[in-house]
């Protein structure tokens, strides 16, 4: 176990919540001068922390506990009928891991995704600097999983490979391929890859009951939620 007591953390001032517009949010960050050590990262992921760019963070709101860390235990997961259909529908998609990088191919896909799927969000409008700062980090455990259909890039799953599982950082995909449900397929693939690697779980970030955009996470069962400082299994 890493000696977490020696680590420093900093809390932000209250700011508008990205998920619940009526709420003010506070975020707890690991000291940015602390090297991004994979063992520290893995241990903090067990406590609900996530990575964004070069920072590890988790919600630290005083009056709200709506953001609940969620993970899928890979060894226990069984796809339901709809998920099996998604897997079948995408059998012709190949997946390859590469190191994070900025390419025009990646950025073009990212722009199309943000403009068509998240034009109402705080990541709009997309920019090259935003893409690089958020996703293209030179970290030894970070991967871009390329999803290709007959050689054509249709999705990227930005994923951190940790000793305790895969952390699904961000996924973006071709909005023209809506029939394929590529976002859901990426999660199903990550669950399968976690099992193939003999790791524990896929860390999906935060589930928020009253946020419609987060509802998809509880479609993967069983799921574990981090509540009252412990992981609780829901079947």
Curated annotation (Swiss-Prot):
GO terms for biological process: ubiquitin-dependent protein catabolic process via the N-end rule pathway. Coiled coil: none annotated. Its main location: cytoplasm. One of its GO terms (molecular function) is leucyl-tRNA--protein transferase activity. It is an enzyme of class 2 (transferase). Keywords: Acyltransferase, Cytoplasm, Transferase. It is found in: Cytoplasm. It comes from the Bacteria. SUPFAM superfamilies: Acyl-CoA N-acyltransferases (Nat) (SSF55729). It catalyses: N-terminal L-glutamyl-[protein] + L-leucyl-tRNA(Leu) = N-terminal L-leucyl-L-glutamyl-[protein] + tRNA(Leu) + H(+); N-terminal L-aspartyl-[protein] + L-leucyl-tRNA(Leu) = N-terminal L-leucyl-L-aspartyl-[protein] + tRNA(Leu) + H(+). InterPro entries: Acyl_CoA_acyltransferase, Asp_Glu_LeuTrfase, N-end_Aminoacyl_Trfase, N-end_Aminoacyl_Trfase_C, N-end_Aminoacyl_Trfase_N. GO terms for cellular component: cytoplasm. Its EC number is 2.3.2.29. Pfam families: ATE_C, ATE_N. Transmembrane segments: none annotated. Belongs to the R-transferase family. Bpt subfamily. Functions in the N-end rule pathway of protein degradation where it conjugates Leu from its aminoacyl-tRNA to the N-termini of proteins containing an N-terminal aspartate or glutamate. PANTHER family: ARGININE-TRNA-PROTEIN TRANSFERASE 1, ARGINYL-TRNA--PROTEIN TRANSFERASE 1. This is Aspartate/glutamate leucyltransferase. The lineage of its organism: Bacteria, Pseudomonadati, Pseudomonadota, Gammaproteobacteria, Pseudomonadales.
């Amino acid at each position: 176990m890493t000696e977490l007591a020696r680590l420093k953390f900093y809390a932000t001032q209250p700011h508008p919540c990205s998920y619940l517009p009526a709420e003010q949010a506070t975020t707890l960050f690991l000291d940015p001068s602390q090297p991004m050590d994979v063992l520290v990262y893995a241990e903090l992921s067990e406590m609900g922390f996530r990575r964004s760019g070069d920072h590890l963070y988790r919600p630290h709101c005083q009056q709200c506990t709506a953001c609940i860390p969620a993970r899928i235990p890979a060894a226990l997961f069984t796809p339901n009928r709809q998920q099996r259909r998604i897997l079948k529908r995408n059998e012709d998609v190949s997946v390859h891991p590469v190191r994070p990088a900025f390419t025009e191919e990646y950025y073009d896909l990212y722009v199309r995704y943000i403009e068509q799927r998240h034009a109402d969000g705080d990541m709009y409008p997309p920019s090259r600097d935003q893409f690089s700062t958020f996703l293209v980090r030179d970290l030894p455990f970070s991967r871009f999983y390329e999803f290709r259909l007959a050689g054509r890039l249709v999705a990227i799953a930005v994923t951190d490979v940790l000793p305790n599982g895969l952390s699904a950082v961000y996924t973006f995909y071709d909005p023209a391929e809506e029939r394929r449900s590529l976002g859901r397929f990426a999660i199903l693939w990550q669950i399968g890859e976690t099992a193939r690697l003999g790791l524990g779980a896929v860390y999906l970030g935060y589930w928020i009951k009253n946020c419609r955009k987060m509802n998809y996470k509880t479609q993967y069962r069983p799921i574990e939620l981090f509540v009252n400082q412990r992981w609780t299994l829901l079947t």
